């Protein structure tokens, strides 16, 4: 327990120190909301990636879709990297940076208002952004409660309070620049953490090949299998899984959304140059491949950890308990790494949501 708490304290301390350090870049509204439009490609790429992949992906989606589709759920990660990251940067990166710089727009609603010369459009879009980011933010707290309950026996409300306070402190102190630097640090933690967790889980199953063999012996689940594939052998290690059509739908749904999410598109507003966009495209795509593919690949082994703990009173699978169950037997050091990993994923997304929604509400609703 001491090791896990120590890692948390170090993590929290670093976040606050970064907020204090970044305060010097906050000289005006532009500096607070966009870091003075001088953020480098690596910081922007990591900020984009960490905003994309939160605790919802690691704890929720990885467990749910890994359970349904097995190792073929890794295709979701590939789709996220190629469509949600690479395509988004290619289509929007340079264009968004140029247009928002030219129009001096700091938020998505402000861009719409100036681009189409419509104050009504700006007002409506600001309300949409502010209102619909609230349930997304709430979902982050929900997924985190499962993991913190396993690791520390924390009460849900204390987890919410601690995260909210920490996010508020470093966002208020350093604005976008603090968020970007912390996102970079949190991204490094996520990269190291997901690799360590995958290795540990596979070793616990006797190695990669042994885990594959065990997974291949699990029979078809009629609830999550296309009717034409009910007789297939080894559905959870197959190339396209037991239900390719629905798998394709999940890939599209989880990948295309990034093209319109304000907290992610806003990263392009702040990048310092068009040249930096090219570097950011490569870095962001590679980051997405490791994190997203890693999460879904890990979730693909979820059925090896089938136990009464993952079922509700009505017999239905509680998908958000699958990943915590997989990790429950790990040593304290590794659980500490996992907690910091998920906390990093959540804090990075949460800070982006807070900054985006607050700046939109202030600049586009109250001020407008």
Residue ranges of model-derived segments:
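Membrane-interfacial loop-to-helix junctions in multi-pass transporters
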Residues: 39-42, 116-123, 152-161, 240-244, ...
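Membrane-interface helix-loop-helix modules in multi-pass membrane proteins
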Residues: 33-104, 245-257, 264-266, 270-308, ...
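Membrane-water interface regions at transmembrane-helix termini and the short interhelical loops
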Residues: 67-69, 92-95, 146-150, 165-186, ...
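Membrane-interface "cap" regions at the ends of multi-pass membrane proteins
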Residues: 1-60, 174
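Helix-loop-helix module between adjacent transmembrane segments
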Residues: 15, 76-171, 250-257, 344-352
